[in-house]
Amino acid sequence: MKLGYAKNAHQLHFILAFNQNKEKSKGGTYYYDGAQPYKNMQTLWYHYAAQASNFDVSLLFMNLGLETGDAETETSRTRYLQTFGTYVTYQPESGNWLPVQAAFYYQTGKNKNAQSVSAFMASVKAAYAIDKQWSVSLGYDYLSGSDGEGDKFKAFDPLYGTHHKFYGAMDYFYASAWQGVAPGLQDAQLGVNFKTSKQVSMQLNYHYFATAAKLDDVKKGLGSEMDYQLDWNVMKDVKLSAGYSIMRGTKSMDVVKGGDHKRWQDWGWVSVNINPRILFVKW
């Protein structure tokens, strides 16, 4: 359920959610099984965006209930994890700077393993338009990790983020599981965008990955990834996209993700997006 309020530059959303396994005739269990379901969730989101201001600001608070238990004995317990923080964009008034983006989020409470959590993530990205065709961007993401020491679990969980949009197009991180560790992630990015015409654009992005936490006998550097993407607006409502990515990992990548970093790792793809407007009614 979502309740919303909007007036002028202000938006406020309040979201409530509750899940129960439909196949159970009794009880209220919704056991965590490796995907990322939740038993219940409460979220408060506020956004401020004034046309006269160069700032857009979002504030988020989420309380997430994750249920674990024993299906045979039908005993369960719900642990609550809180995530809160802000996302800000700023448009410089002078020059060819594109909007600067920054975010910070903190997690506390308990995870599904009943561990006390103290974790955070931070990110910043800036872009500059050289001319009407060329632009460059620079960014950095930091998601805290856990080294196994202390009484707090320090690895930030991005939960329901659009993982394919971040941390490289090959989805090495967070879209797939770690190899029995939770080292966090550092992602330093450098990108170049080129518009050949109004219909065609290309982008090339470089990522350098490293762990956030220091693990025993493992260096932080994980490797580098290069992502290329071509977008072509063929006609109204039809878009063709294609891309190619390569990853060059290190020995540390073998430890945290498995596999063999010496093997060639690449990925190519082509997609056609057809998005026609079938029916439009204006009251």
Where are these regions (language model features)?
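Outer-membrane beta-barrel "beta-signal"
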Residues: 263-283
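Signature for the C-terminal beta-barrel architecture of outer-membrane proteins
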Residues: 1-150, 190, 195, 208-210, ...
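C-terminal structured "cap/appendage" subdomains that terminate the fold
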Residues: 228-251
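A glycine-biased, small/acidic residue-tolerant capping/turn segment at secondary-structure junctions
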Residues: 151-154, 250-260
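C-terminal structural cap/anchor segments
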Residues: 137-226
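Extracytoplasmic loops and strand-loop junctions of Gram-negative outer membrane beta-barrel proteins
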Residues: 27-31, 70-72, 108, 169-177, ...
